[in-house]
Amino acid sequence: MRPARALIDLQALRHNYRLARELTGAKALAVIKADAYGHGAVRCALALEAEADGFAVACIEEALELRAAGIKAPVLLLEGFFEASELALIAEHDLWCVVHSLWQLEAIEKTPLHKPLNVWLKLDSGMHRVGLHPKDYHDAYQRLLASGKVSRIVLMTHFARADELDADATSQQIAVFEAARQGLAAECSLRNSPGVLGWPQAPSDWVRPGLMLYGATPFEVAQAEAARLQPVMTLQSRVISVRELPAGEPVGYGAKFVSPRPTRVGVVAMGYADGYPRQAPNGTPVLVAGKRTQLIGRVSMDMLSIDLTDVPQATVGSPVEFWGKQVLASEVAAHAGTIPYQIFCNLKRVPRDYIGE
């Protein structure tokens, strides 16, 4: 069998969820959208269900997958519904629903429902993606109550720059939210992963840890609470070929690496079809046989090359770690000019093995 695998440590996942609770004293929705950021939504939900206050996903399809797997905990639809016909399913499966636009509010008012909805009313506090304008927020809240179709309303917003610890934008968003919710008697939810780790002043009865659940930092700089996270995924494979090259020889497509010295090259069963970033440059760190080395040459669809010159013990069959507990996903992402969210979500072909059940 091809040796490319993703090892998922469910005990680390639980540790990170508990950390979100510990840091905030709030209830926490585990964000497992996009197949739990490439970690497997159903398995992650089953691992957390005994202690999680609920889960959050992007859409009804993701929520119904959880329900089909027997997950009975609350599930919030972060994008809400896309057409009014979904409201019956939302009510039938006891899903919680974000309302971020006036058209959604109007759909709730007009659609007959056999049971009331749990609604999270989203404010656009400055990100300008989705969310109600502050001038419409009070009226939308009152209309939801008057509709008789909601059992509870939670007030929420989403931070645009909470991963920038010195940015004023997050404080400004908090101020906009606080002004908009004046006089509204409801729980609130503001803090995503960077909000949980770095913005203790942000109010939140509910928090929404996403990236931090999987043990990756949302920050580009060192941060004390993020240092307590435990990586959940280890992306690994094995060396499948070794060759010795003299100085001056090219490696891989486009000859993007030319050996500056006699070089021992290992080829590994991992490529961009597995989700490893094609744009990762020469020098991107990897771990082989327990020792750090680096990527050389362009990443191919199914294979890539690494420098084994200073790892003489490495040979065919030696284990390779691309990210995990020793090479952090955030470090690889930074080399590749992207973010850990993306490299996790891109893992489509690699089989997952679970430990820490």
From Swiss-Prot:
<keyword id="KW-0663">Pyridoxal phosphate</keyword>
<comment type="pathway">
    <text>Amino-acid biosynthesis; D-alanine biosynthesis; D-alanine from L-alanine: step 1/1.</text>
</comment>
<dbReference type="InterPro" id="IPR001608">
    <property type="entry name" value="Ala_racemase_N"/>
</dbReference>
<dbReference type="GO" id="GO:0030632">
    <property type="term" value="P:D-alanine biosynthetic process"/>
</dbReference>
<feature type="active site" description="Proton acceptor; specific for D-alanine">
    <location>
        <position position="33"/>
    </location>
</feature>
<comment type="similarity">
    <text>Belongs to the alanine racemase family.</text>
</comment>
<dbReference type="InterPro" id="IPR011079">
    <property type="entry name" value="Ala_racemase_C"/>
</dbReference>
<feature type="binding site">
    <location>
        <position position="129"/>
    </location>
    <ligand>
        <name>substrate</name>
    </ligand>
</feature>
<protein>
    <recommendedName>
        <fullName>Alanine racemase, catabolic</fullName>
        <ecNumber>5.1.1.1</ecNumber>
    </recommendedName>
</protein>
<feature type="active site" description="Proton acceptor; specific for L-alanine">
    <location>
        <position position="253"/>
    </location>
</feature>
<dbReference type="GO" id="GO:0008784">
    <property type="term" value="F:alanine racemase activity"/>
</dbReference>
<dbReference type="GO" id="GO:0030170">
    <property type="term" value="F:pyridoxal phosphate binding"/>
</dbReference>
<feature type="modified residue" description="N6-(pyridoxal phosphate)lysine">
    <location>
        <position position="33"/>
    </location>
</feature>
<keyword id="KW-0413">Isomerase</keyword>
<comment type="function">
    <text>Isomerizes L-alanine to D-alanine which is then likely oxidized to pyruvate by DadA. Shows racemase activity with both alanine stereoisomers, negligible activity with D-cysteine and L-serine, and exhibits no activity with the remaining natural chiral amino acids.</text>
</comment>
<dbReference type="InterPro" id="IPR029066">
    <property type="entry name" value="PLP-binding_barrel"/>
</dbReference>
<dbReference type="InterPro" id="IPR020622">
    <property type="entry name" value="Ala_racemase_pyridoxalP-BS"/>
</dbReference>
<dbReference type="Pfam" id="PF00842">
    <property type="entry name" value="Ala_racemase_C"/>
</dbReference>
<dbReference type="InterPro" id="IPR000821">
    <property type="entry name" value="Ala_racemase"/>
</dbReference>
<feature type="binding site">
    <location>
        <position position="301"/>
    </location>
    <ligand>
        <name>substrate</name>
    </ligand>
</feature>
<dbReference type="GO" id="GO:0005829">
    <property type="term" value="C:cytosol"/>
</dbReference>
<dbReference type="InterPro" id="IPR009006">
    <property type="entry name" value="Ala_racemase/Decarboxylase_C"/>
</dbReference>
<dbReference type="Pfam" id="PF01168">
    <property type="entry name" value="Ala_racemase_N"/>
</dbReference>
